[in-house]
């Protein structure tokens, strides 16, 4: 069931809004958190652009049925752009009975829209993970 959750009007409110959207476990609800030009980067480093592609990636996480935990490490703001470094985890037993211990550090970018609300422009959940030769 799609729920319209509030977006943040301040940079400091981005993470609480993100967590509420993520833990809805609803792809359509979470898609409302993304900028129209947004993208998500998968664990292999591939960028998925557009609502349909982002939705497919989100569905993989939401299928676990777990609530995400997030600790904000850094928030830097320059005008209408915010850089976030977030430690996150999915820990528990997935819907299929699999034990999950997924922990990573995200490097994300949010942008304030013309309506004054912050949305994710770049969602890079495995941002600090080394992905091979540069």
In which residue ranges do the predicted regions lie?
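A beta-strand edge to alpha-helix "cap/lid" segment located at domain peripheries
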Residues: 2-29, 39-134
């Amino acid at each position: 069931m799609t729920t319209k959750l509030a977006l943040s009007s301040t940079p400091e409110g981005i993470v609480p809004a993100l967590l509420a959207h993520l833990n809805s476990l609803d792809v359509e609800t979470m898609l409302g958190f993304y900028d129209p030009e947004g993208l998500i980067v998968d664990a292999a480093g591939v960028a998925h652009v557009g609502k349909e592609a982002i939705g497919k990636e989100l569905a993989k996480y939401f299928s676990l049925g777990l609530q995400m935990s997030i600790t904000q490490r850094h928030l830097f703001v320059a005008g209408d752009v915010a850089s976030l470094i977030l430690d996150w985890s999915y820990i528990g037993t997935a819907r299929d009975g699999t034990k999950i211990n997924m922990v990573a550090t995200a490097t994300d970018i949010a942008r304030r829209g013309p309506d004054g609300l912050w949305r994710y422009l770049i969602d890079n959940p495995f941002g600090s993970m080394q992905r091979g030769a540069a």
